[in-house]
Regions:
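Aromatic-anchored segments of alpha-helical transmembrane domains
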Residues: 19-24, 111-120
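Start-transfer (signal-anchor) and selected internal transmembrane alpha helices
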Residues: 1-20
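Membrane-interface coil-to-helix junctions
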Residues: 23-66, 70-75
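Long, non-transmembrane cytosolic or organellar matrix-exposed soluble domains/tails
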Residues: 257-437
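Transmembrane-helix signature of polytopic, membrane-embedded enzymes
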Residues: 95-114
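Soluble catalytic regions of membrane-associated enzymes that act on cell-envelope
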Residues: 129-298, 321-322, 326-340
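Juxtamembrane "helix-exit" motif on the non-cytosolic side of transmembrane helices
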Residues: 26-36, 94-95, 117-125
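Transmembrane-helix motifs of polytopic, lipid-linked glycan transferases
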Residues: 81-99
Length: 437
């Protein structure tokens, strides 16, 4: 008992460090990512001299030094725990130096660390805005490529923001199940796939740049990334954005611009190895074309300047026409036309693509074509093979609507009806009718 009494301060400090570590690594892991991508610490003398020329610059230097470690979850959490304990121990040391070190004061020395964590690490917007917290979480999950976690979160707690819907559909696309499973999740029209950057919050631009990049819309990905770069406060730089801008210019063959971003990144702790590797082969067309990631992106990128803002379906169609093996772009093209309720185009695209990409036509596409054919061509044979259960469910859905005269009949709001394309179609048509004067 006496030994425990003598050790209680050390045990309390250890428990505090563990608590900070766990908080950062789990509930606040996405927030660490948010901070990391808004700063860029460089290990070179020029950066040090530049930042330390003013008090504000020195503060930014220290904040960026801490934030760089957030790139790796456990390392960032460990640094936060060490800093929190260091501050607490410094305060206790000061109290001892001025001879105010009664044991009952020891727990109070943790208060400054707790307050600093709460007010400096957790932004006010994160504390106040539920939608901002959702956006921060989805952005981190996309960056970390945690597709199953995105889908689990979206299924159990349907997204309240468009950013959440983009990320959900992107996760389905990266798993190769977008056209099979998209209507198991919340959908909100074609904007749930890609959207005009001028209508986005800055945080959403990180994720939408990732989505455009993987599809092959390299120029759009670059525009979104550059928009983030311009919107960062206080002239901050972002390692994530600098890497994306280097990547887009590398894929497009703009080596002079790519080199500029890589030169900055090569003096960073966690982006440096990547930058030095690609600086060494920059300009070597054969090496880049043979690169597993960037060579593949070159084959599926749009050859002409894409205009995502004005005609998404045309851009996606062009991507597929230029590279018929670009399945992600084909998935997005079919999903976009389904969400836009353009069933004639869905049928045309499917007939053109099914031999190369869809020997087994995905579930949602079968549902949309089956219903379209039942309504528009009741006496003609189906243009593609339709599964028996899919056809029966679709026919039953449309029959109930015809009998009740209500597209949103409550009896249809149960599985399997509410997980089909036609449930989305009915809801979308209902919204269109409400919008009409």
């Amino acid at each position: 008992m006496k030994k425990l009494k003598a050790m209680w301060k050390g045990l309390l400090t250890m428990a505090f460090a563990i608590a900070v570590f766990i908080l950062c690594l789990f509930p606040y892991r996405a927030l660490m990512n948010y901070h990391e991508q808004r700063h860029l610490f460089r290990w070179d003398s020029y950066y040090f001299q530049e930042q330390c020329a003013s008090l504000d610059g020195l503060c930014e230097y220290l904040i960026s030094w801490i934030a760089q470690f957030f790139y790796i979850g456990w390392l960032g959490a460990a640094v936060m725990a060490l800093l929190a304990v260091a501050l607490q121990q410094a305060i206790w040391t000061i109290l001892k130096l001025i001879r105010i070190h009664r044991s009952w004061l020891y727990p109070l020395t943790f208060i400054p660390s707790i307050l600093l964590f709460y007010y400096a690490f957790i932004p006010q917007e994160y504390k106040d805005d539920r939608l901002f917290r959702e956006a921060v979480t989805y952005d981190y999950l996309v960056r970390a490529q945690k597709w199953n976690k995105i889908l689990g979160k979206s299924y159990n707690h349907p997204p309240e923001t468009m950013n959440g819907i983009w990320c959900t559909n992107f996760a389905l696309g990266m798993r190769g199940t977008l056209l099979d499973d998209m209507f198991f999740y919340k959908q909100d029209g074609p904007d749930g796939l890609l959207m005009d950057a001028t209508r986005m919050q800055p945080l959403a631009l990180y994720s939408i740049s990732d989505i455009a990049f993987e599809i092959g819309m390299i120029n759009s990905a670059e525009r979104f990334a550059f928009d983030v770069k311009q919107r960062l406060p206080n002239n901050h730089k972002s390692g994530r954005i600098y890497q994306r801008l280097a990547e887009t210019n590398l894929v497009n063959g703009h080596y002079k611009i790519a080199r500029k971003y890589m030169h900055v990144l090569q003096s960073t702790l966690f982006y440096g190895r990547w930058a030095r590797h690609y600086l060494a082969i920059l300009g070597d067309e054969q090496a880049i074309n043979n690169d597993a990631r960037y060579g593949a992106l070159r084959t599926r990128r749009q050859q002409s300047n894409d205009q995502l803002i004005y005609a998404q379906d045309q851009v996606l169609a062009q991507l597929v026409a230029e590279n018929p093996k670009n399945k992600l772009a084909a998935d997005y093209l079919l999903a976009y036309t389904m969400l836009r309720l353009d069933l004639e185009s869905v049928t045309e695209h499917t007939l053109r693509l099914k031999d190369n990409l869809y020997p087994n036509v995905p579930k949602s596409v079968q549902e949309s074509i089956a219903g379209y054919w039942i309504m528009k061509h009741p006496n003609d044979s189906l243009p593609i093979p339709i599964g028996k259960s899919i056809y029966q469910t679709t026919a039953s859905y449309l029959s109930i609507i015809n009998q009740s005269g209500n597209m949103l009949d409550p009896s249809l709001d149960v599985p399997p009806y509410n997980q089909s394309y036609w449930h989305y179609h009915a809801q979308a048509m209902g919204k269109l009718k409400q919008q009409r004067p």
